[in-house]
C-alpha cells in the first residue's frame, strides 16, 4: 500500500514529469537550431538580451536559450546534452539542487542555466571546490560561452585588483568558494570605491554543493591581521595616567562613570609625550590609549568590576556578582586593565573581517547547486538555504553491484582482507580504487601493498592537477589507486580497454564515513554511464564509527561463536545498524550547524548594517549630513546622561556636560554652566547644537571644500573600521565564553543575542563619539590620506584536502577534561574552569 501511495504522492516524480515536458520542448527545437549558421546562432544571444530588456522574463526565454546552448555545445565541444541534462539545467535555473550521479555531465548541464542567467548582464558565478577545477572548466566551457558571444572570467587567489575586476565584470566568472568569499570581505575593507572588485551578488551555481554548503559550512573565512598597536602604548599610557590628579587633570562623574581630561590634563599629556596637539589625527591611537588607561584607573575597581585570577583579569557581572569567564572588555579596555594590574598584556591578533560560507552564499539573489549526493541532506538544504533537492535519473541505468558490508573483529584483520582482495583483482587485471577516511590509513595500506609487490598510486588531495591525471588513469587495466575521500573530485574515471569484460572498476571502502553521503560518493566513482562495476566496504569493530555506537555486543557475539580475525560477518542487520549510526551522527552534525547558524546570524545582521553604512560613506559626495546626525546623537546622549529624568533639575550635573563639551566638542568657554542653568534638556541640546554647528561652519571656511570632504571621509572610515574590528573580536570572546553561563535556566543563545545587541549599540555610540571629537577638535592638514587600520591576511581554511575532521569554530559546545581550557589559560580544562564541574 505504502508503495502505491509513494508512487502517487512522490514529489520527486511530479517534479520530473514537469521537467520532462520542458526538456521535450527544448528537444523539439533541435532541428531548427541545427539549420542556423554559426553567425545566426551567435546572433541569438543579442536577440535574447534585447527581449529580456523589453520585459520578457528568463522563464519565457528558457526553452529557446537552452536549445541554442545545446546546439552550440555540439559544434564547439562535440557534446550534445541529453534530455536528463536539460532537466538538470532547469532545476538549476529555478534555484534548486540537481542530484546527478557521477559521470552524468554536471559541468555541461550547468552551461544552459549559466548562459540563460548571464543574459541579464548581472554576472553569474560558477563555484568549484579547487582552483584546478575552476581553471579547467573556465577554459573548456569558456570556449562555448565565447562562441555564443558572452565573456568569461577566472578568479584565482593572488590576482591583482585589476585582474579581479576584469574577471568579475565578465558575464560569467569561475572561481573557488574561498576566493569569492574573501573578495566579498576585502571589498568591505577598501578605502576607495574604485577598489571594489565584486558586483552585487546575483546568481551562483555551486558545483559539489554538498561539500561547500554542508561539509564546509562551519569553516569561517577569516581575514586577520595584527592591529598596528603594540602593548608598549598600554604600558606608557598607564605610567602617565598614574601621575594625574583628580579634579585638576581630570574630572570624574560617579553616577555616569564618565571620566574626562581637563585642559590642564591635556597640556600635561602633550608635554609628557612631546607632541603639540593631542587631538591631531596622527595621535588618534595615543589619545585612545590615554582614555583607556584613565577609565581603567578611575572607573574600574578591582574586586568590584573585575577580579584577578591566575594572572588573568576576569569580569564580574554587575547584576549577579558572578564571574563572566571568557568575556573580555572590548576596544582595548581589557588590555588597559592588564597594564594597570601589571599583568601580561594579551596581544591582540585582530580578526578584521569574517563570514561563514552559509552566510556568504545566502546573500545571492538566487543560488543553485549540483552534486552526485544530496538527497540525504535534503532537510538541511531546505531549512537553511531554501533549496529543494531534485534527483535527476541517469541517462542509462546503473548496473553497478553494491555488496553488503564485510565486518571483521580487528582493524588488522580488516586490512589483511582488503590487501588480499586487491591482490586477487589486480592479478586478473581489474582496476581497483581504494577509498580511505584518513591519510594515515592510505599510508598503512600503501606499505602493505609494497610488501606484496603490487604497484599503486596514492592520492592525498595535495596536488589537484596531478591528481586529476592519476584519477583519470584509475580505470586502466591493472591500475590500483588509493585515495582519501576528497581526492580527485570532479574528475571522471573512464574505463580502459578490456576492463568492462573484467567487471569494470572495483571500489573498495576501508571504513564507513560518519556521513552516508561521502560513502555514496565513493561508490559512485564506479558504474558511470551504465558501465559495469562493483563496490564493497570492509569494516572492523575497532573503527571509530563502530566504537562510537556500541560494537561491544557484536564483539562478545563473535567471541562466543569462536570467530577469528579472518572470518567476517556479512549481515543485513549489522549494515542497518551502521546506517542508523550514520543517521544519528548526521543528525547531530545538522543540529550543530543549525546552532552555529543561529549564533552566526547575530553577527550577520550587524555585519550587514556596518557594511551598508560603510558603502554609503564611500559612495556619498558629501558626508556632512551623516556626520551632523552623529554629532547630534552624541550631544543628546551626553545631556541625557547628566540630566536624568528621575532627578530634580537642581541635582543635574551641568558641570559634567560642560566638562564633556570642553574635552571633546567645543573650545573652553563656548558653553558655560550658566548658559545651561534653568533650561530643559531639550533646550540645552538645541543650544549646544547651535554652537557646534557654528564651529563646523567656521571650519568649512578654513579649508577648501574638497579637502574638508576628504577629511570627513578619513575620520568616519577610520572610526568605523577600528571599532568594528574591536567589536568582532569582542563578539568572538563572548561566544567562546557564553556556554559557561548555561547555569540557572539561562539560554546561552538568548544571552548571546541580548549582549551582542547591547555591545553593537555601544559600538555605534563609540563610532559617533570618535567621529564627533575628531571633526570638532582635530586640526586639518593638507596631506590627508585614508589609512587601513590594520594589514589583513586571508586565512585559508584547508583546501579540500582529505575530508578534514571538521573543527567546529565554536570550541564551546563540549570540552573534554583533558582539552585545553576554552578560557584561554593554556591549562587543561580539568585543572582550570572544569574543576568545579
Swiss-Prot record:
Signal peptide: none annotated. GO terms for biological process: intracellular protein transmembrane transport; protein import; protein targeting; protein transport by the Sec complex. Residues 787-806 have a biased composition (Basic and acidic residues). May bind 1 zinc ion per subunit. It is found in: Cell membrane; Cytoplasm. ATP binds at residues 85, 103-107, 492. It catalyses: ATP + H2O + cellular proteinSide 1 = ADP + phosphate + cellular proteinSide 2. It comes from the Bacteria. One of its GO terms (molecular function) is metal ion binding. InterPro entries: Helicase_ATP-bd, Helicase_C-like, P-loop_NTPase, SEC_C_motif, SecA, SecA_CS, SecA_DEAD, SecA_motor_DEAD. It is an enzyme of class 7 (translocase). One of its GO terms (cellular component) is cell envelope Sec protein transport complex. Residues 787-813 are annotated as: Disordered. Zn(2+) binds at residues 821, 823, 832-833. Keywords: ATP-binding, Cell membrane, Cytoplasm, Membrane, Metal-binding, Nucleotide-binding, Protein transport, Translocase, Translocation, Transport, Zinc. Its EC number is 7.4.2.8. It is a peripheral membrane protein. Its main location: membrane. PROSITE patterns: SECA, SECA_MOTOR_DEAD. Its cofactor is Zn(2+). Belongs to the SecA family. Monomer and homodimer. Part of the essential Sec protein translocation apparatus which comprises SecA, SecYEG and auxiliary proteins SecDF. Other proteins may also be involved. Part of the Sec protein translocase complex. Interacts with the SecYEG preprotein conducting channel. Has a central role in coupling the hydrolysis of ATP to the transfer of proteins into and across the cell membrane, serving as an ATP-driven molecular motor driving the stepwise translocation of polypeptide chains across the membrane. This is Protein translocase subunit SecA 1.
